[in-house]
């Protein structure tokens, strides 16, 4: 018995390789007697595909599984929508790194066939939600699977802010900003900023300062249930931006307050059977193999 009956397809736009893999995947799914629905934006690059179309939010409501063909950015974008319906997501890598999209396009029929036959592993990944308040009123909100980043925007200047964890004062800082990362995001921008790699099963949030004007500032790891609050200094000349996964952003003003916490909804991420997180790290990050290999 197949665990999935209705499959949604989302593809990376502007990538001929992704389109090629999408067409190949559609042909394969057509042999499996499954209902297939194509994301309406993806459908613009799949002329005459012959399948029903729907928005991403509707895909989450209608589908048992959504397959994303693209890079990690494509999956991050889909995750922020599909987490609302807890729809399982499976990634086929047609990007660069592919930390989250772990099926090779060369193995698409074999590996996806195994998943459709019920041979897969699933895990829950939490997201972060950021809110910006001005004079006590919410002026913006956004969420991210990888991270929430506070940065000065286009201006190359430092910003001043105060950091609080669960209402307790941590420090005041002048820096280029702060990366607040999930375990999923610990191998993304936070890694470039000198943050630790955090196993995705850990319920933890990492805070990584960006070029702090101090010799003693280091990344901090806190419980994922923590509430992170940032008070933007009123004397800042820059208008700090709050960026989620590098894809959505809210512009703040000096004096604003930002609150970041774990989002209630989680992403259900599907992997082929035998998925190994540390093997992924070795492959994607260029870690050394065992001696003699």
Curated annotation (Swiss-Prot):
GO cellular component terms given for this protein: cytoplasm
Keywords: ATP-binding, Cytoplasm, Kinase, NAD, NADP, Nucleotide-binding, Transferase
Primary localization: cytoplasm
Keyword Metal-binding recorded: no
E.C. code: 2.7.1.23
Protein's cellular compartments: Cytoplasm
Active site: 72 (proton acceptor)
GO molecular function: ATP binding; metal ion binding; NAD binding; NAD+ kinase activity
Binding annotation for NAD(+): 72-73, 146-147, 157, 174, 176, 187-192, 247
Any one of the GO BP annotations: NAD metabolic process
Cofactor(s) essential for the protein: a divalent metal cation
Catalytic activity: NAD(+) + ATP = ADP + NADP(+) + H(+)
Family, per entry: Belongs to the NAD kinase family.
Listed HAMAP family: NAD_kinase (MF_00361)
PANTHER family: NAD KINASE
Record function comment: Involved in the regulation of the intracellular balance of NAD and NADP, and is a key enzyme in the biosynthesis of NADP. Catalyzes specifically the phosphorylation on 2'-hydroxyl of the adenosine moiety of NAD to yield NADP.
Protein name: NAD kinase
Provenance organism: Chromohalobacter salexigens (strain ATCC BAA-138 / DSM 3043 / CIP 106854 / NCIMB 13768 / 1H11)
């Amino acid at each position: 018995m197949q665990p999935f009956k209705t499959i949604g397809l989302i593809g990376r736009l502007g990538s001929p390789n992704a389109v090629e893999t999408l067409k190949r995947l559609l042909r394969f799914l057509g042999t499996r007697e499954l209902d297939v629905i194509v994301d309406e934006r993806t459908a613009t690059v799949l002329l005459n595909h012959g399948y029903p179309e729907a928005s991403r939010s509707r895909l989450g409501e209608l589908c048992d599984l959504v397959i994303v063909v693209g890079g990690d950015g494509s999956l991050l974008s889909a995750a922020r929508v599909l987490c609302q319906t807890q729809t399982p997501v499976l990634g086929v890598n047609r990007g660069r790194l592919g930390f989250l999209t772990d099926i090779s396009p060369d193995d698409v029929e074999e590996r996806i066939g195994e998943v459709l036959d019920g041979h897969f592993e699933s895990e829950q990944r939490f997201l972060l939600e950021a809110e910006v308040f001005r004079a006590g009123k919410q002026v913006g909100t956004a969420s991210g699977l990888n991270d929430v980043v506070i940065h000065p925007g286009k201006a190359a200047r430092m910003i001043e802010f105060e950091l609080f964890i669960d209402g307790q004062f941590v420090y005041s800082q002048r820096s280029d900003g702060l990366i607040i990362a999930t375990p999923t995001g610990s191998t993304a921008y936070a890694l470039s900023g000198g943050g630790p790699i955090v196993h995705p099963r850990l319920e933890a949030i990492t805070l990584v300062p960006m070029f702090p004007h101090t010799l003693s500032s280091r990344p901090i790891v806190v419980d994922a249930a923590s509430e992170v609050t940032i008070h933007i200094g009123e004397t800042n000349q820059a208008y700090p931006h709050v960026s989620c996964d590098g894809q959505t952003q809210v512009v703040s003003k000096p004096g604003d307050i930002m609150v970041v916490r774990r989002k209630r909804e989680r992403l259900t991420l599907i992997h082929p059977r035998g998925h190994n997180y540390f093997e992924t790290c070795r492959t994607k990050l260029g870690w050394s193999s065992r001696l003699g290999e």
